[in-house]
Amino acid sequence: NPHYVDKDRDLDIACRRIAWGKFMNSGQTCVAPDYILCDPSIQSQVVEKLKKSLKEFYGEDAKKSRDYGRIINSRHFQRVMGLLEGQKVAYGGTGDATTRYIAPTILTDVDPESPVMQEEVFGPVLPIMCVRSLEEAIQFITQREKPLALYVFSPNDKVIKKMIAETSSGGVTANDVVVHISVHSLPYGGVGDSGMGSYHGRKSFETFSHRRSCLVRPLLNEETLKARYPRARPICPDT
């Protein structure tokens, strides 16, 4: 699930909302932001403001916070920790296999071909990759599998509309994260690799119900239907 941050956005608000959506349940939600795309000129600011928000939410040591979760099992713990190998860690990066704790982690200058950028993270690891324009961000997103969710932070409606028009995803939230799944009038689901079909509200009835086709015809006007019935006719003799 990509997250594009416009350099003209209010970064304090953007990073607080990103940190909330990414690190709730230790990143183990299907609509959590998987990575951030931003201009290189704001990467360091994004890191610092994310760190500020994380400390606001979970304190100086998230391991001691009653609100910070743990990884679901040991196998998944090892998988997520393996994604950190060879990466530049700007924050966090530590783990405790005994309690399956992984610290809120931010990665910078990430190689787009590295494993952490090739699969759903589903853990408290947030890579940041730099792009120099909205067009480059869109190109990066469209060259990959279609995500379940896509997020864009921008004060510019044209930026938001362009991102929506030129990408494909299960859902989009602009200037926030995750919350589109809480609006029951909006269908929730994926597209392509992120799954097909959707539910919520009326869409739930349509998705989980079978629309059975039924036709009842009258026993009238048989004379007009003669043309559809075959007639017994002799086979033409060979000539």
From Swiss-Prot:
Its EC number is 1.2.1.5. PROSITE patterns: ALDEHYDE_DEHYDR_CYS (PS00070). It catalyses: an aldehyde + NAD(+) + H2O = a carboxylate + NADH + 2 H(+); octanal + NAD(+) + H2O = octanoate + NADH + 2 H(+). InterPro entries: Ald_DH/histidinol_DH, Ald_DH_C, Ald_DH_CS_CYS, Ald_DH_N, Aldehyde_DH_dom, Aldehyde_DH_NAD(P). GO terms for biological process: aldehyde metabolic process; lipid metabolic process. The active site is at residue 30. It holds the Pfam family Aldedh. It is found in: Cytoplasm. GO terms for cellular component: cytoplasm. One of its GO terms (molecular function) is 3-chloroallyl aldehyde dehydrogenase activity. Keywords: Cytoplasm, Lipid metabolism, NADP, Oxidoreductase. Homodimer. Belongs to the aldehyde dehydrogenase family. ALDHs play a major role in the detoxification of alcohol-derived acetaldehyde. They are involved in the metabolism of corticosteroids, biogenic amines, neurotransmitters, and lipid peroxidation. Oxidizes medium and long chain aldehydes into non-toxic fatty acids. Preferentially oxidizes aromatic aldehyde substrates. Comprises about 50 percent of corneal epithelial soluble proteins. May play a role in preventing corneal damage caused by ultraviolet light. This is Aldehyde dehydrogenase, dimeric NADP-preferring. It comes from Bos taurus. The lineage of its organism: Eukaryota, Metazoa, Chordata, Craniata, Vertebrata. The gene is ALDH3A1.
